[in-house]
Design a protein with these regions (language model features):
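Paired small-residue
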Residues: 88, 99-107
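Cytoplasmic helix-loop-helix junction between adjacent transmembrane helices
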Residues: 104-141
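Pair of pore-lining "gating" transmembrane helices in MFS-fold secondary transporters
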Residues: 2-30, 206-212
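Small-residue (Gly/Pro/Ala) motifs that create kinks and tight helix-helix packing interfaces
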Residues: 29, 120, 144-156, 164
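Conserved MFS/SLC helix-loop-helix module at the cytosolic interface between two early adjacent transmembrane helices
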Residues: 59-96
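Residue-level signature of mid-helix packing/kink "hotspots" within the transmembrane helices
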Residues: 23, 54-63, 145-146
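C-terminal membrane-cytosol helix-exit motif in multi-pass small-molecule transporters
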Residues: 169-193
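Extracellular/periplasmic helix-loop-helix junction of adjacent transmembrane segments
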Residues: 28-59
Length: 212
């Protein structure tokens, strides 16, 4: 596997992880609510609103993440994404009540906001088969959506809701440190667009017909 292929694999897994982490709570809410002493029938309805700040920050912090990446480093921001989302997931598992879960999930949402404006920008860098790379990256993101209830449900079946946050968190942090080493050794450099691709930046010939 070439350095560029490995770079894309890291970025694709980042999209998978981004959506997976944002949906862990949707599956684990009932178990967490029961652990906090909420009534069985109303546990889900009572717990779900505590995830709302996470969803708001997931969107609201994206422009901030993009600005920091432009001023600082996209590779560094991807490292922050992996380690930050993993660490906050582990911290969320230590919650002793709904308010603490809301705070933990809100922090998780801040780090989750990094991926889309930063990771997808990195996927399209360098020209070439941009559409193909975006398509594959999108599949990984959708797999994260699909895998979240399956993975979380499996962990809940064998243990409890805390492990559902801890296990993915540990894996994400390990990947973050791996990407840091990969970038530190020069493997995460963005590919250069060819001179021909640079000369053709702009609208494709006949683009006006697409508007009719």
């Amino acid at each position: 596997m070439s350095a560029q292929q490995l770079r894309l694999l890291f970025l694709n897994f980042g999209h998978f992880a981004d959506h997976l982490f944002m949906l862990i709570f949707a599956k684990a809410a009932v178990s967490a609510g029961l652990a906090f002493g909420l009534a069985g029938e109303g546990a889900y309805a009572e717990m779900i609103p505590y995830g709302l700040p996470s969803l708001i920050l997931f969107g609201a912090c994206a422009p901030i993440a993009a600005h920091i990446a432009d001023k600082w480093s996209r590779n560094a921001m991807i490292v922050v994404f992996f380690i930050g989302i993993g660490f906050t997931s582990i911290m969320t598992s230590l919650s002793t009540g709904p308010i603490e879960i809301a705070i933990g999930l809100a922090a998780l949402g801040v780090f989750a906001a990094i991926y889309h404006p930063v990771g997808i920008t990195m996927v399209i860098e360098g020209g070439g088969r941009v559409g193909w790379r975006l398509g594959v990256n999108g599949v990984w993101g959708n797999m994260g959506v699909a895998a979240a209830p399956l993975i979380t449900g499996f962990i809940l079946a064998i243990y409890d809701w805390r492990l559902a946050f801890v296990l993915p968190g540990i894996i994400s942090m390990l990947i973050g440190f791996s990407y840091w080493f990969f970038a530190y050794t020069g493997g995460a450099k963005a590919p250069e667009a060819t001179a021909r691709e640079k000369a053709h930046v702009g609208f494709a010939p006949g683009w006006q017909r697409a508007l009719i």
